[in-house]
Amino acid sequence: AGFMPTFVIGGQLNSVGLNARLGKGKYLIAEADESDASFRYLHPMIAVVTNIDNDHLGTYDNDFNKLKAGFLEFLGKLPFYGSVIACIDDPVVKDLLPLFKRRTITFGITEEADFRAKNIVSSGLHSSFFVERRFAGSDLEVELSMPGKHNVLNALAAIAVASEENIADEQII
């Protein structure tokens, strides 16, 4: 999109060979997870929830309800004007949607998603699909240089965040 955000992520970003970079502008992208429960101390403006599963249960006394409560605590740190971008394809996330107390935008492959991938085609190391946007303009055609449903879902989440930030379609794609 032409931005150079600051980022801190768990793995190395292939395009720059780093897992963190001090960028320019107003955006900071942090990959936060529930592994040590420290995500509960963050105060994001927009939070993306891709899935909630029983990884790292030891941090939560092997109690899945405590893990879910940790996510709700994290999302409760969003300001009143903040947004949750949530994968409606994940059954646990879908069950918790009514408990999210902030504006919530869903993404996924299911028809009920606000940002829905359809006509997904994978060929070799590439994927292409159309994004049907319920509330944000016309469909977008997307081509990724990586295969896999998880990459399609991650792209949908990024498109939803960019749309929420009023970034023009031409910059998103």
Language-model features, listed with the residues they occupy:
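Short beta-strand-centered segment that lines the nucleotide-binding/catalytic pocket of NTP-utilizing
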Residues: 3-16
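The start of beta-strands in P-loop NTPase/AAA+ ATPase cores
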Residues: 5, 26-28, 45-46, 82, ...
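General beta-strand structural signal in soluble alpha/beta enzymes
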Residues: 6-9, 31, 85-86, 106-107
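Acidic, Mg2+-coordinating active-site environments of NTP-dependent enzymes
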Residues: 15, 48-173
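Conserved phosphate-binding catalytic cores of ATP/NTP-utilizing and phosphoryl-transfer enzymes
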Residues: 16-21, 26, 151
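Switch II (G3) loop of P-loop NTPases
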Residues: 26-36
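Switch II of P-loop NTPase G domains
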Residues: 35-45
